[in-house]
Amino acid sequence: MTNKSLFSPFSINNHELKNRFVMAPMTRNFAPDGIPSEYAPEYYAKRAKGGVALILTEGVEVSHPSSSGYPDVPNLTSSESKKMWSQVVKEVHKYNSKIFCQLWHVGGIRKPGIDKNKDVPGYTPSGLVKANKKVAYEMTLEDIQEMVSIYAKDAKICEELGFDGVEIHGAHGYLIDQFFWSDTNIRSDKYGGSLEKRTQFARDIIQACQNVTSKDFSVGIRFSQWKQQDYDAKLALNENELKTFVDCLSESKPDFFHTSMRRFWEPEMNNSSLAALVKGMTDIPVIGVGSVGLDKDFIRL
């Protein structure tokens, strides 16, 4: 891809983007009681005004008591938070940009006492946040089904608020990634074991979100090799495993993949980045991010 290509239009689902610049999600901790601050509409609108074609919001907690792991993270539960998100969307749309809401559950990263739901533990597939480190709650099949339903309900809320789509946060060692990762998923039912089974939770969520929203509403997923618990972690040890992973997720027909790399200049395997590898394995649009810095080339571009 040449620099010129970055400024060419691109489509995700039925959304035509004016260029190929995407603002990646960044946690801001500016949402007391889960309500985006009064400055949130201006914050996101500045990026749209600057020319970014697609904005992915900061992580937004799904509407379950166990979803929170950090202070002052926004949610979708109150009328006040919904009102602010609606204003954010309206401001972004003024500049012919699209905006997707990132739906986030931290999983076992949650520590009891982090918020008003003080006795609610961190939810995980197997009670693990790292190999042999069992410090969290192991989800039952009923818990999993409930969580899938909650993601779907929140996706529907996002569409009603005017968002153009949602990104399911499946990266960085949080809940969905804990299902992906063999170190934290040692289940023996349909949600654990093989790599294919470890993607089942994510596939169920993607399909559930699609089932309750319109065909023009985009549903995609973010994933990574690295975890905040282990920067050297791997979902896939080689290209064959990565292809299996991508193929499994593709069965749910997500509208995009968002590959998160700690260092975009460091090859993932075979001298290629994760984004490049995934792009070569699927026709589904691929977003890539990882430590973009303000070097001279970036400033000139």
Residue ranges and their predicted role:
Residues 1-301:
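Flavin-dependent oxidoreductase catalytic cores
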